[in-house]
Amino acid sequence: MHGESPIKRRESRKIWVGSVPVGGDAPIAVQSMTNSDTNDVAATVAQINRLEAAGVDIVRVSVPDMDAAEAFGRIKQLVKVPLVADIHFDYRIALRVAELGVDCLRINPGNIGREDRVRAVVDAARDRGIPIRIGVNAGSLEKDLQKKYGEPTPEALVESALRHVEHLERLNFQDFKVSVKASDVFMAVAAYRLLAKQIVQPLHLGITEAGGLRSGTVKSAVGLGMLLAEGIGDTIRISLAADPVEEVKVGYDILKSLRLRSRGINFIACPSCSRQNFDVVKTMNELEGRLEDLLVPLDVAVIGCVVNGPGEAKEAHIGLTGGTPNLIYIDGKPAQKLTNDNLVDELERLIREKAAEKAEADASVIVRG
């Protein structure tokens, strides 16, 4: 039952990706990217639906050629969540997906080609109200910047980004967001800090090619956590060599830990020791699996003994403290005693009841407001 986040977010211009606001006073949007073959429409739609069920706000889809562009158009008709088309090199692909209803174009103006081609893409985006993401990556910096700096640096990333920002602004286009990604945490953080001071556009945060599920989660949590804690960032994507649904889960967990956005259960659990009166690890694994469908923000404490249990339980909506017998707290007050028999079943029941009660109360406040 913790309060609002103490973080003061950087002021930025608000843009819209489909129905999702990004920047300004909008909640930080959670993104992911499909890793299916875009030409396999059924598989890509199924993956997007899974991402949407996990709570994703925006999904990016790679569109490498014209066949994929046509597939993208069919995919767009079959899903509800806003879609970003990831496009490189061939400006005609951007023009085609704009015709097919894309919600955002992810391009690098530096590899689209001549000025007239960039202008054609910008005109198509402007005519249809489509925003653009300028995506700068340490692994694909322009050759002149590689020569100037010798290697990727925060300054090189920012110079590349500003070059493209100025390009769009010369074309009188302001409806864009920017990312400056690197796989090195320090480089990415430094680049975003520099860029945040120089532009007002919303920033898309990410540590690119972060790694597998565990290592990538840690890298992303460290890098994005540093930036988000400073108020930098308007939308995030956790890049993992894993099921894209895991990217969404990790993204929400990072935002929940900083109290920037709440969705589903925020578990507070001890690592367990010989004082535990029930199997904390097993209990947590079962609860997390059973309660993934709950979207209502709730703090649930699962503590194995009485050393820290009562204190943590009193701060949660639902708290379990190990003892003889175990004790359940609801809204900070002792509510009932539990034995280890059917412990998880009973705790799940109480959590679901509390979630329903909170959802009804929240809806009532919205209606009265």
Curated annotation (Swiss-Prot):
Its BP terms in the Gene Ontology are: isopentenyl diphosphate biosynthetic process, methylerythritol 4-phosphate pathway; terpenoid biosynthetic process
Reactions listed under catalytic activity? (2E)-4-hydroxy-3-methylbut-2-enyl diphosphate + oxidized [flavodoxin] + H2O + 2 H(+) = 2-C-methyl-D-erythritol 2,4-cyclic diphosphate + reduced [flavodoxin]
Residues recorded as binding [4Fe-4S] cluster, renumbered to this chain, are 270, 273, 305, 312
Q: Give each disulfide bond as a residue pair.
A: none
UniProt-listed Pfam families: GcpE
Q: Which InterPro entries match?
A: Dihydropteroate_synth-like_sf, IspG_bac, IspG_bac-typ, NO2/SO3_Rdtase_4Fe4S_sf
The record's cofactor note says: Binds 1 [4Fe-4S] cluster.
Which pathway, metabolic or otherwise, does it act in? Isoprenoid biosynthesis; isopentenyl diphosphate biosynthesis via DXP pathway; isopentenyl diphosphate from 1-deoxy-D-xylulose 5-phosphate: step 5/6
* Entry's EC annotation: 1.17.7.3
Q: Does the keyword Iron-sulfur apply?
A: yes
The residue range of the signal peptide is none
Can you provide one Gene Ontology molecular function annotated for this UniProt record?
4 iron, 4 sulfur cluster binding
Cofactor dependence:
[4Fe-4S] cluster
Q: Which UniProt keywords apply?
A: 4Fe-4S, Iron, Iron-sulfur, Isoprene biosynthesis, Metal-binding, Oxidoreductase
Q: Does the keyword Secreted apply?
A: no
Family the UniProt entry places it in: Belongs to the IspG family.
Q: Which PANTHER family match?
A: 4-HYDROXY-3-METHYLBUT-2-EN-1-YL DIPHOSPHATE SYNTHASE (PTHR30454), 4-HYDROXY-3-METHYLBUT-2-EN-1-YL DIPHOSPHATE SYNTHASE (FERREDOXIN), CHLOROPLASTIC (PTHR30454:SF0)
NCBIfam families the UniProt entry points to? ispG_gcpE (TIGR00612), PRK00366.1 (NF001540)
Tell me the function of this protein.
Converts 2C-methyl-D-erythritol 2,4-cyclodiphosphate (ME-2,4cPP) into 1-hydroxy-2-methyl-2-(E)-butenyl 4-diphosphate.
In Swiss-Prot or TrEMBL terms, this protein is called: 4-hydroxy-3-methylbut-2-en-1-yl diphosphate synthase (flavodoxin)
Species, as recorded: Pseudomonas savastanoi pv. phaseolicola (strain 1448A / Race 6)
Q: What is the lineage of its organism?
A: Bacteria, Pseudomonadati, Pseudomonadota, Gammaproteobacteria, Pseudomonadales
